[in-house]
Every structure is written in C-alpha cells, then in structure tokens.
Regions:
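Short acidic low-complexity segments
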Residues: 241-249
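ATP-dependent helicase/translocase motor core
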Residues: 1-211, 216-236, 249-253
Length: 253
C-alpha cells in the first residue's frame, strides 16, 4: 500500500510509539513538527518567507525534564528510510546548538524499517520499534557517565594470560572505534569463559554495559558459566538461580 508520509505517521509510526509508551498527543512527551531555528543563508539579512531560517523535525521525544532525548525523521513507506538519515542528523546537531543541550539520539524510519543512531558513538543500526522514555534516559545516562575503554583496567585475576589480555584489549579498543561486531576464536582449554567474564567485568566497570546476555547451547555449559560468574563477579546478580524458569529482569547477567 502506497501511504503518504502523513498516513505513514498516523497509521504506523504513531502506533509504534504508543507501543513503547509514548503519547504523541501529549506535548510533554512528544512534539510533532518541532521548530528548529537555523542561521539564514550568508548574504540574506531578513527571511523572505515565514519558514526561512526554520527546520521542522517530524517528531522530537522529550525526557522527563522536558529536554529533547531523540529526533525521529519519517518517510512514507515506499521510500527508503535511509533518505532521512542526513536530515535527522542535521536536526539533532541543530537542536543541540539551539538549546545548548545534550545531543539527541537519532532515528529515521519509513514505518517498515527503523534505524537508531547514537551519532558520535556508534554507526546506525536497524531496530525493531522505538525505546521507551526510561530506556532512552538510561542510554543518555550511560553515554554521559561511561569511561574510555582504551585505558580500562583488565582484571588479570580473572583472565591473566597474555593472549587473553590481548583479545580483551582488542575488543575494548574496537568498541572505542565504534565497531559493534567481534569474533574471538579460541581453542578448548584456553579459557574462553574467563576471557568473556573479564571482558564483561571491564565493560561494566567502565559503564559501557548495564546487562549482559551470556548465551550457551547446552545446560551443562550454562551451569559452568554460572559457577564461573559467581566466582569471579560475585556481587553481580545472575539469572537463573536453581529452579528459576521465568526471566528475571533485575539481574545483570
């Protein structure tokens, strides 16, 4: 179905925002057609039209303090969502400049595909839906308070072999370079689990990770991993404990 941009917003994007707890009719949460003041073209002293020197963001999501958390640029369903990428980026930087606030997070979507961009920290990535207000505020808190990973201490009491330290350091440096995907190939007996735990420990201490999913393909490996996390990161709550089947959202591992 060929929807216009207005139909795409009303029929799809508004509903997706509602699923994440955003009320597009509440101006304390969402502002549509957010007015962004921009400089006039060089040599133009006065605006020739009421809209010259203005940009209008399709949506701006607000934090509980009323400041912009995120910008959403919408395109109609039959257009490539990526066509809104640079436009959304420009809006984010102009809002930051206009308000003197933190740089908003960036979204661009056609209703069928949505991309999230933490502009100065990671490349855009495809997501399913929009984060809640609490999620975005948590992302902003992490971004504001995390420490550089290049100098982060690696606990050699967890993984102290030279090749383990090199592997962890390589991943930490890659994250600082805005990379998102890493593959470590390690033979049996080389300390894969302890290498992962030391990496998780460094990421959590630096404020780059709040929760970690450690995925295994056999129950026996799950028990081994749980025991290892209990030994080397005893203060971090883990799931599952004995007999637990329902996922507990208050655990960090």
């Amino acid at each position: 179905m060929d929807r216009t941009e207005a139909q795409t917003r009303a029929d799809i994007i508004d509903q997706q925002l509602a699923l994440s707890g955003w009320n597009v009719k509440d101006p304390t949460q969402v502002i549509e057609e957010f007015d962004i003041l921009t400089a006039l073209t060089e040599g133009v002293a006065e605006p020739r039209t009421p809209y010259q020197g203005h940009q209008f963001s399709d949506y701006v999501l607000l934090g509980k303090n009323g400041k912009p958390l995120a910008v959403i640029e919408a395109k109609k369903t039959l257009r490539d969502a990526a066509l809104g990428r640079e436009q959304a980026k420009q809006y984010c930087y102009n809002i930051q400049k206009q308000l003197g606030s933190e740089l908003p997070f960036c979204f661009y979507t056609n209703g069928l595909e949505t991309f999230f961009w933490d502009l100065e920290n990671a490349p855009p990535r495809k997501v399913v839906g929009f984060p809640t207000r609490d999620d975005l505020e948590r992302f902003a808190y992490i971004r504001r308070n995390r420490k550089p990973l290049t100098q982060e201490f690696i606990s050699t009491s967890i993984a102290g072999r030279d090749y383990q330290i090199r592997a962890i350091r390589s991943v930490l440096e890659g994250i600082e370079q805005k990379k998102r995907d890493f593959l470590l190939v390690m033979a049996t007996g080389t300390g894969k689990t302890r290498t992962c735990i030391a990496m998780v420990d460094a990421l959590m201490r630096a404020g780059h990770a709040e929760k970690v999913l450690f995925l295994v393909d056999r129950i026996a490996l799950r028990e081994q991993a749980l025991a290892a996390f209990k030994e080397y990161m005893p203060n971090e709550p883990r799931w599952p404990n004995v007999g637990e089947k329902l996922i507990a959202t208050d655990r960090r591992v």
